[in-house]
């Protein structure tokens, strides 16, 4: 009877406890308690101020309860906080007492289907679960409620935990340095994937049901950190964010942003999921440890998701069944009527006295069509995640078709136009070019000393006074005045002029003044010669010689005599050469018969020229015998010597005394 009375009292409180407080969208646990924020990250309330070391956090969106663990509490390890009415923000229920085997709870996650709370303990290296609706009894009555889900090795540090309720999977992180990993397991604890490659001290982890991915944070080597992402099978890994000098501990996504905690500077960061460079700090204060972004994701937005439809339907059936039971108990003790009525086939959740709407409706009473005035220039449809989506007209884009596709497309005052196929094109202003008019034709540094203007889509330069060149890069006075003339700028005409020296005149000091005495009829020369003193007529200079100088006539005669002498000697040598006796040239032919030994190539007869033997031994060849050449002999004698030598038995050498001696 006592337990029934408690249940009835609790049911009555649920019915009459209609939510009057401001709705919160985010909650952050800090050293000074639990802080509640609206969608603009303005703090609207706080609670649990007696807790200063909250280590883990989970949320029940059906009953709107927060579950958390505090490291320093001596008696209990899990607590709950009711977030429905404002006056309940400070009402904390003690759910699970500590025991001798209790370890340091590092992660909490809530399963709406089985209404179980899962957690990881660092000291016991274990994953546990418990049915939360059975908690709150005396300590000795909770021993049999706790279920051991998984036991990991001692060299594993369980750091965080999350649940994919739609596909019924658990994910936890192992932050031990040598064995760091991301683990995917079944709800009964059976490990399905243990991803270790390039994982270093992972910490907080969360499931993004909007994109079917998981996010986790890693404390990298030294000062670095990363926020990593992978699909639900822990594949297709991507580094979402990289940075330094921060200590990220927790991560939580919504449809557009990813929120993560930096314990180094006590900040909560908001980073756009589509562009990680777009980030801002939404909270800075007491040391944050965990956060939850409340979006009604499971019950409100996953009703049409094929992967979640069956699970969500079963959750709603459980809520309907429980609401009927609570309603019957409440009507038995009070005649107070229902405070709200759900429209458009909405379901009343008696636990929270609020409506669970169909996908097409929203609002407190499900009175607002979700597509009502949502699309500005397009048609609205309800997506698989129960969110409104727009099919925009050809000229518009954006989440709500509220932006013309030409807005901001053409830069630098370019005009945008649409083709028949909906393609954008730009007509650029005079000084710009490119597909979006993004390129300036005249840049600031094109003309060095002048003003740039566009002529036929080509940059041109109007030079400042005193400069010239295609890009005004040359000073006009450079090498302008010749013959050491001085270049100056005329202040009246703004043109350069030359101040010439005493010997020159002309526009550029190019005319010698002595030429001005010549009357050549050149008008250009005459205009520069006006006012120039006329010099005397040019005459042939008189040459005088000193008395002690040399006599050139003597020199010329000496040179002529020497040349004549050389010529005479040359003639005499030539004549002497012509009259010298020639060397004899004797040719004799030998006719070779069949009885003669062959000494040459086969032919009718073999011939040999005597002079061809001159390259033989000097004793065998008379033509190069130096003694014979020096001996005075008549031509007939010399010829006879050669003939005798050829016919000798020795063959081809002469019977000279020197050669005979050499033979002996």
From Swiss-Prot:
List of glycosylated residues: 40, 140, 188, 431, 491, 551
SUPFAM superfamilies reported for this sequence: EGF/Laminin, YWTD domain
Topology feature Extracellular, residues: 22-552
Residue stretches in coiled coil: none
Gene3D superfamilies: Laminin, TolB, C-terminal domain
Keyword Cell wall biogenesis/degradation belongs to the record: no
Subcellular localization(s) per the UniProt record: Cell membrane
Residue ranges of every copy of the EGF-like domain listed in the record: 367-399, 402-438, 473-510
Membrane topology field: Single-pass type I membrane protein
One GO term (biological process): oogenesis
GO molecular function list: Wnt receptor activity; Wnt-protein binding
Annotated keywords: Cell membrane, Differentiation, Disulfide bond, EGF-like domain, Glycoprotein, Membrane, Oogenesis, Repeat, Signal, Spermatogenesis, Transmembrane, Transmembrane helix
Stretches assigned to the Cytoplasmic side: 574-664
LDL-receptor class B repeat positions: 115-157, 168-211, 212-257
Glycosyltransferase is among the record's keywords: no
One Gene Ontology cellular component: plasma membrane
Main location: membrane
Signal peptide start-end: 1-21
Disulfide bonds: 371-380, 375-390, 406-416, 410-426, 428-437, 477-487, 481-498, 500-509
Residue ranges of the TM segments: 553-573
Family, per entry: Belongs to the cueball family.
Task of the protein: Has a role in spermatogenesis and oogenesis.
Name of the protein this chain belongs to: Protein cueball
Naturally occurring in which organism (per UniProt): Aedes aegypti (Yellowfever mosquito)
Gene: cue
